[in-house]
């Protein structure tokens, strides 16, 4: 995905309702539905409720990343629950100064709770980033694949599809450019999807019989590896491939708890 010179943000989603739900009920449901207690993740993910508010939710916002920009948009729209994929602690331990201090001020001043789900939202069979992207591409009979921290996080599908057609479908699904390194078959045999930054796993992916690999970003050497392995490698951008899960989860919660939701779009260009 082409790099962007600056961050941009915009809002999408319905905001009409004025109903209310208990934060504890939403959190409990998410923890159970996403199986947080069963799924291992990176330490800095700290999945679940990361910051509480006063206890009530009237509007839900979702975003890929926890950021000042996202919190500012929450405040503008009166949202008091922010659901993210990369949470408050993703950068690791930091002193509460500068950016982190500003983020916490925004959250406290505007009564915003923060809930984060990383791998649990990547691998969920209905709401997950991988399942949602596969659905957006029209892929069916998907199977889980690629073990990470004891669970299968990606999806794969056996489908014969011209690789150029898949490239076009991916561009439409992501509403943006795709970097395509076409060294594999002109018609796909098995497509593997792992959203985000999984390009460095290309050798492991190849061992699972994948001839066409879709992910968000990859190191430089992965393009060389794709050539050596005879694979098609399609990079849609880390951010662009991971908008699906937070959108799907927020929409699901909106329907279940009768509160409105919106997606806060803050593309990073990566």
Name these PLM-found stretches.
Residues 4-5, 9-12:
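Low-acidity, Ser/Thr- and Arg-rich intrinsically disordered low-complexity segments
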Residues 11, 15-270:
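Active-site catalytic microenvironments in core metabolic enzymes, especially phosphate/sugar-handling
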